A protein has these predicted regions:
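Conserved active-site segments centered on acidic
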Residues: 2-75
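Short glycine-/acidic-enriched loop or helix-start segments at secondary-structure transitions
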Residues: 20-22, 48, 93-98, 117
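Alpha-helix C-terminal capping/helix-to-coil transition sites in glycosyltransferase folds
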Residues: 79-80
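Short, Asp-centered acidic motifs that coordinate Mg2+ and/or phosphate
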Residues: 83
């Protein structure tokens, strides 16, 4: 097994929910093989409170997560990226900066849990559920990604497999 560490950037427009969740999942489950980052094309400037609550509920420390611009990752001195995943449809349609390292890119669209409004009549349960489902959907995709033989697979096959992962929504899915 290689000692190589891969740099992975997750993008969504606001960098306040889905991309933050993805960054946290990969940091937690990546086994030290990955440096996970997240950013947005138009960052909101703060992480959605329900995203932080979802992470905290799972025992993930939240103090290091912040909403930031993707410009940080296109600037001189930024980490050379190996993979860039857009996780919202808006970011997938935008013209991205030139990333250092010429990373593989693909789209892993996840419904935006932040569009579910917390209501007082149910104690915000609908919004909590939306964030929980977004977390689980992203976790499934990241686990499929982590199972790929990155050190031994050819580039074309790897690109195809990470694209297929983005189309995967089923619990028991695999990437053939």
């Amino acid at each position: 097994m290689s000692d190589r560490t891969y740099n992975v950037l997750f993008l969504c427009t606001g960098n306040s929910a889905r991309s933050i969740l993805a960054e946290a999942i990969l940091k937690r489950e990546g086994g030290g093989r990955f440096h996970a980052f997240s950013a947005g094309s138009f960052p909101k400037g703060e992480v959605h409170p329900a995203a932080l609550a979802q992470l905290a509920e799972l025992g993930i420390a939240t103090e290091d997560y912040r909403s930031k611009s993707w410009d940080e990752f296109a600037a001189e001195g930024a980490p050379q990226l190996d993979f860039v995943f857009t996780v919202c449809d808006n970011a997938a349609g935008e013209t991205c900066p030139i990333w250092p390292g010429q990373p593989m890119t693909t789209h892993w669209g996840i419904e935006d849990p932040a569009t579910v409004v917390a209501s007082d009549h149910n104690g915000g349960e609908g919004q909590r559920q939306a964030f929980r489902l977004a977390y689980l959907a992203m976790q499934r995709r990241i686990r499929l990604f982590l199972a790929l033989p990155l050190e031994s697979i050819d580039e074309l096959s790897l690109q195809r497999k990470i694209r297929v992962i983005g189309q995967t929504a089923d619990e028991g899915a695999s990437v053939a």
